[in-house]
């Protein structure tokens, strides 16, 4: 969330930032509501002061005037509460300001490829897509997934389930033992205020699964609960930076047009992901972003799968992000670069929404922390890349060397 004072004093900058994102935000309405709020607050202060003076008087005229004032004050308090509620809602719908280093672009087609790592495999045969390989090996069952839950669900069986478990264990081990992240296992159902703090609500409610009776929300990503671990807390500077990693299932409606990405396990209502999350001092956040990208890339390097790094343009960075990078793995069976990680610096956007602050000294005024998030990495697209890059002519799949200690086998046949 942007600071209201910042919007008031930098209105044109905010308008330009919103335009650069190729989106809209209720800036005019925010300014009108802010003006109304201040007018009502001033009138209330005046009437309350007058009521205190009149309360000391005992004549009938003063008593009558006091009664009238109480009624007017009650009306103004109700009106002010309604205005403040609307103002908060509109502020929650304004995206973060892109950093000056982010290229301006109208959509994802203008994202900038920064570099490629690894070489595409030179196949002596035509590589098959993962759905053909998975069904032939009986490690992915699409029909029974649909029978249980409908479209965009699937079942992993046998070595397929073990492969995913091996990937998750490998990623968690690398991030905790080598990169120094603290592992968290959060709830999959969280309160509404958690998703407001993370930036998913109110703007993206239509893409989330919700239990209306209990008002619980299924996590779209572990970023949401991790944002809230320190909600309404004041941290000491010695506690920063804080690095968390969490594995969760993720739940999204993923409303897609018919015919797009309908085959395979690329786009689903439920998928698994290892998430990286950081709290840090404002002056450190962009360095922490580069480190997070390197931590995520190390997974792709270890799996020996070709990948590329993209910097996202202003119109493609997420709602809460000030700067983002995407890591995309190459998958030869579908002949696509698949996004397996998006790493973002949200500056103080989530810190302000979640009210997470820190003090530089015990006597210092609290400041909002900066937060960062990134996939480290996202399944099942990593599964797709592993299956398709490591396939053999007979349809079997070689298990990447780093996964063999977790799998206990060298190949899936």
From Swiss-Prot:
Subcellular location: Cytoplasm
InterPro entries listed in its UniProt record: aa-tRNA-synt_IIb (IPR002314), aa-tRNA-synth_II (IPR006195), aa-tRNA-synth_II/BPL/LPL (IPR045864), Ser-tRNA-ligase_type_1 (IPR002317), Ser-tRNA-synth_1_N (IPR015866), SerRS_1_N_sf (IPR042103), SerRS_core (IPR033729), tRNA-bd_arm (IPR010978)
Alphabetized PROSITE patterns for the sequence: AA_TRNA_LIGASE_II
Pfam families: Seryl_tRNA_N, tRNA-synt_2b
EC number(s) on file: 6.1.1.11
Pathway: Aminoacyl-tRNA biosynthesis; selenocysteinyl-tRNA(Sec) biosynthesis; L-seryl-tRNA(Sec) from L-serine and tRNA(Sec): step 1/1
Principal EC category: ligase
Catalytic reactions on record: tRNA(Ser) + L-serine + ATP = L-seryl-tRNA(Ser) + AMP + diphosphate + H(+); tRNA(Sec) + L-serine + ATP = L-seryl-tRNA(Sec) + AMP + diphosphate + H(+)
Name of the protein: Serine--tRNA ligase
Organism of provenance: Dehalococcoides mccartyi (strain ATCC BAA-2266 / KCTC 15142 / 195)
Lineage: Bacteria, Bacillati, Chloroflexota, Dehalococcoidia, Dehalococcoidales
């Amino acid at each position: 969330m942007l600071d209201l004072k910042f919007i008031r004093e930098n209105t044109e900058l905010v308008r330009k930032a919103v335009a650069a994102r190729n989106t809209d935000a209720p800036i005019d309405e925010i300014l009108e509501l802010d003006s109304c709020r201040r007018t009502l607050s001033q009138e209330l202060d005046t009437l309350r002061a007058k009521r205190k003076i009149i309360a000391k008087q005992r004549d009938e005229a003063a008593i009558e005037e006091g009664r009238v004032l109480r009624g007017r004050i009650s009306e103004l308090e109700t009106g002010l509460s309604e205005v403040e509620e609307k103002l908060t809602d509109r502020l929650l719908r304004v995206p973060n300001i892109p950093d000056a280093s982010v290229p301006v672009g109208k959509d994802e087609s203008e994202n900038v490829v920064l570099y490629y790592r690894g070489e595409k495999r030179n196949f002596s045969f035509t590589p098959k897509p993962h759905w053909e390989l998975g069904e032939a090996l009986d490690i992915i069952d699409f029909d029974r997934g649909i029978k249980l839950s409908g479209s965009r669900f699937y079942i992993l069986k046998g070595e397929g389930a073990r492969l995913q478990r091996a990937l998750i264990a490998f990623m968690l081990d690398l991030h905790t033992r080598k990169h120094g992240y603290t592992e968290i296992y959060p709830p999959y159902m969280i309160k509404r205020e958690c998703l407001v703090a993370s930036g998913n609500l109110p703007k993206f409610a239509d893409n989330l699964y919700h239990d209306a009776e209990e008002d619980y929300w299924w996590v779209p990503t572990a970023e949401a609960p991790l944002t809230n671990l320190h909600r309404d807390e004041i941290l000491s500077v010695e506690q920063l930076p804080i690095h968390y990693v969490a594995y969760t299932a993720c739940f999204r409606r993923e409303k897609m047009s018919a015919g797009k990405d309908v085959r395979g396990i690329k786009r689903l209502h439920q998928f698994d992901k290892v998430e990286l999350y950081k709290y840090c001092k404002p002056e450190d956040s962009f360095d922490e972003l580069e480190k997070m990208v390197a931590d995520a890339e190390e997974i792709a390097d270890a799996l020996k799968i070709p990948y590329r790094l993209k910097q996202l343009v202003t119109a493609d960075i997420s709602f809460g992000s000030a700067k983002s990078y995407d890591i995309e793995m190459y998958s030869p069976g579908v002949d696509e670069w698949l996004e397996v990680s998006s790493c973002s610096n949200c500056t103080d956007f989530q810190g302000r929404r979640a009210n997470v602050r820190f003090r530089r000294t015990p006597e210092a005024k609290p400041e909002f922390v900066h937060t960062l998030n990134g996939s480290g990495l996202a399944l099942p697209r990593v599964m797709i890349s592993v299956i398709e890059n490591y396939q053999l002519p007979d349809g079997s799949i070689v298990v990447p060397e780093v996964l063999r200690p977790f799998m206990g086998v060298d190949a899936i046949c």
